[in-house]
Design a protein with these regions (language model features):
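Sequence/structural signature of beta-propeller domains
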Residues: 1-303
Length: 303
């Protein structure tokens, strides 16, 4: 997983295990359909508390999805994961002859982590919201007996009427709800808390020219953070409120991540996975660039 080719694209808690989802679970060519990976919560807390100095050792969980990648036209891997008990939900991205597509699929994870097995017959398309390449539904929420998928780009010029799509736990479509305009990308989200709130990664890569904008309402209201370089990357966590009528921005400042500046040529880090950690803050993980990074971000003071 430390290699960038792991391309970790999602995080989710399964009980007391943090599950890391590679975009292509068979990236290491370990046979079969590959693996997802699990880190025990106790190991993560011990590492953060300084009582464990050794490296974190992920547990491979065999991934079973027979023939699924070959059935999806233009398959480009998995993008999001969430759990409801032992039921797993994942999104898939595809670049087809007719444009970008996203799909939802479900399966079961074994309590002993012996396998995560997808039911390939449940593959369900998520309607696209723009014609921009390499964009699909990259965040996934479980809200009671509903699943909520969130599209990657929701800025005013690229998606003027953003929506979140709803499904039941059998993946039957259950309508849509409104989603707020927000510039740049949404690449993952935490689970809902008891008040229906969640945080999401809001990221901008300067090479993503179709998402370039002169107007960023969040930055205009709250500022960009002291390490921002004009024209450079944006890395922030933004809080949202979910209810059955729609999703709205919470009126509070984003958490601005300290940017690496010229160390990465102003390009930033491609954060693709996000979970809360025991009231302490957040765990984030990068996709391919600049490498696989698992990071801890503390809760803002006063929370």
């Amino acid at each position: 997983l430390v290699r960038s080719r792991a391309e970790v694209s999602g995080l989710a808690w399964y009980g007391d295990y943090l599950i890391l989802l590679p975009q292509y679970p068979n990236f290491a060519h370990q046979g079969g359909d590959g693996a997802v990976y699990a880190l025990p919560r106790v190991d993560l807390l011990a590492w953060l508390d300084g009582s464990s100095a050794g490296p974190l050792e992920p547990i491979p969980v065999p991934f079973v999805a027979p023939g699924l990648a070959g059935r999806v036209d233009g398959y480009e891997g998995y993008e999001a994961i969430a759990f409801l008990g032992g039921q797993a939900f994942l999104t898939i991205e595809a670049d087809t002859r007719d444009g970008m597509r996203a799909y939802l699929v479900t399966g079961q994870i074994a309590p002993d982590l012996s396998a995560l097995t997808l039911d390939t017959a449940t593959l369900t398309e998520i309607p696209p919201q723009s014609e921009i390449d390499n964009k699909s539904d990259e965040a996934l929420l479980v809200a009671g007996d509903r699943l909520v998928t969130i599209y990657e780009v929701n800025g005013a010029s690229v998606n003027p009427a953003p929506l979140a799509h709803l499904f039941d736990t059998g993946l039957a479509p259950a309508g849509t709800i409104s989603f707020p305009q927000i510039e740049y990308r949404i690449t993952d989200a935490t689970a809902l808390d008891g008040e229906g709130r969640f945080w999401a990664i809001n990221y901008y890569f300067p090479g993503d020219t179709k998402l370039r904008t002169e107007s960023d309402p969040l930055a205009e209201r709250y500022g960009r953070g002291p390490t921002y370089i004009p024209g450079g990357a944006v890395e922030r966590l933004v809080e949202f409120q979910y209810d059955e009528s729609g999703i709205a921005l919470v009126d509070r400042p984003p958490i601005q991540l300290e940017l690496p500046g010229e160390a990465l040529g102003g390009l930033g880090r491609n954060w693709e996975g996000l979970v809360r950690l025991d009231g302490r803050g957040f765990l984030l993980v990068t996709d391919e660039f600049p490498d696989t990074i698992l990071a801890f971000v503390p809760e803002p003071e006063g929370e």
